[in-house]
């Protein structure tokens, strides 16, 4: 028997949730867009640290 989790309950509460079906509407698209945007910011920050274009005063990389 499947266990109920907080994440599962959150996804079930979103509008347009129907397992195995494609329903009209946005569904979980805003959640996916938010996660993608946060990943983009994270990767740009890592790239700036690698290229030393992000100034970090108290951290030295040797």
From Swiss-Prot:
> Which InterPro entries does the record cross-reference, listed alphabetically?
PSII_PsbH, PSII_PsbH_sf
* Cellular compartments annotated: Cellular thylakoid membrane
Query: What is the topology of this protein in the membrane according to its UniProt annotation?
Result: Single-pass membrane protein
Gene Ontology MF terms: phosphate ion binding
One GO biological-process annotation of the entry reads: protein stabilization
SUPFAM superfamilies the UniProt entry points to? Photosystem II 10 kDa phosphoprotein PsbH
Q: Which residues cross the membrane?
A: 30-50
Known Pfam families for this protein? PsbH
Asked if the keyword Protein biosynthesis belongs to this entry, the reply reads no
- What UniProt keywords are attached to this protein's entry? Membrane, Photosynthesis, Photosystem II, Thylakoid, Transmembrane, Transmembrane helix
Record flagged with keyword Membrane: yes
Q: Name one GO cellular component term.
A: photosystem II
Oligomer and partners: PSII is composed of 1 copy each of membrane proteins PsbA, PsbB, PsbC, PsbD, PsbE, PsbF, PsbH, PsbI, PsbJ, PsbK, PsbL, PsbM, PsbT, PsbX, PsbY, Psb30/Ycf12, peripheral proteins PsbO, CyanoQ (PsbQ), PsbU, PsbV and a large number of cofactors. It forms dimeric complexes.
Job of this protein: One of the components of the core complex of photosystem II (PSII), required for its stability and/or assembly. PSII is a light-driven water:plastoquinone oxidoreductase that uses light energy to abstract electrons from H(2)O, generating O(2) and a proton gradient subsequently used for ATP formation. It consists of a core antenna complex that captures photons, and an electron transfer chain that converts photonic excitation into a charge separation.
The family classification in the record reads:
Belongs to the PsbH family.
Q: What is this protein called?
A: Photosystem II reaction center protein H
Gene that encodes the chain: psbH
């Amino acid at each position: 028997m499947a266990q109920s989790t907080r994440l599962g309950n959150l996804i079930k509460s979103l509008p347009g949730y129907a397992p195995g079906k494609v329903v009209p509407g946005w569904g979980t698209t805003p959640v996916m867009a938010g996660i993608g945007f946060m990943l983009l910011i994270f990767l740009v920050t890592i790239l700036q640290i690698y290229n030393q274009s992000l100034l970090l005063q108290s951290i030295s990389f040797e």
